[in-house]
Amino acid sequence: MKNTSKFQNVVIVTIVGWLVLFVFLPDLMIIGTSFLTRDDASFVKMVFTLDNYTRLLDPLYFEVLLHSLNMALIATLACLVLGYPFAWFLAKLPHKVRPLLLFLLIVPFWTNSLIRIYGLKIFLSTKGYLNEFLLWLGVIDTPIRIMFTPSAVIIGLVYILLPFMVMPLYSSIEKLDKPLLEAARDLGASKLQTFIRIIIPLTMPGIIAGCLLVMLPAMGLFYVSDLMGGAKNLLIGNVIKVQFLNIRDWPFGAATSITLTIVMGLMLLVYWRASRLLNKKVELE
């Protein structure tokens, strides 16, 4: 028992130390840097200022933030529309087949997402496989311009983040009470009524979790916007990258990062509140 207790203490200390060293302290450094002044020689001057946050109210940066929210929302809705039927199909398959499809769904996580985006870029380019195939079929006369458009960014985000939507949806659908669905049909409910009034409310936790897992990273995947959208389709993640790596304005980059973190924190708060309300509703029913 003593050895087990010592081992648990070592594990706890290791985890806490890791969080403090690699999460808490870097966050404090970013917060502190966001209130300092830019210096051309040393990047940061130890002079307190709020200008970095007031600059974010500039129409240019505010528009980029709204554009990022819009793109993330569209990508989330697209993932939900595509992911729900697939998760339903996956949950209704025989138990012997499910592990294989789940494995195929998880396999992309083993490959760097940047490499996958490069592959998607080649596939969708003017002389890529998609256009060549459509030209061969005679569906189009000239190649379709997909790359470097907002649509290309959406496609890239959906391509990367779709599994994050499918997994929580699959988990919720798999837990559906079959006798409850059969009872609804016995009482005369149509398939549409059963889906809207029973299935959607019961799978709402998975829907909310999936939307959160897609929307939060969608705002910061700057390399998707760089490779698929070009300079005219920037996300807030691109602004942060440019400020840190190109312009070397670390204080403003830090302020932008903190603002994005606050926005994500508000989304998490909404998710937490929605989850509590859903749990209370289920308990009352």
Spell out what each predicted region is.
Residues F24-Y61, F123, K127-G128, G230, ...:
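Short membrane-interfacial helix/loop motifs at transmembrane-helix boundaries
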Residues A41, L50, I117-V158, L192, ...:
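Membrane-interfacial helix termini and adjacent extracytoplasmic/periplasmic loops
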Residues M1-I30, P99, F103, T261:
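N-terminal signal-anchor/first transmembrane alpha helix
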Residues K2-Q8, Y53-L60, A218, D226-R273:
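Interhelical loop and adjacent transmembrane-helix boundary motif
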Residues K2-K6, V10-T14, L36, Y170-R185, ...:
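C-terminal transmembrane helix and the adjacent membrane-cytosol boundary/short C-terminal tail
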Residues P26, I30-T33, R38-D39, I115-I117, ...:
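Non-cytoplasmic
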Residues V13-F24, F103, V107, Y159, ...:
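Transmembrane alpha-helices
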Residues P59-K92:
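Transmembrane alpha-helix signature in integral membrane proteins
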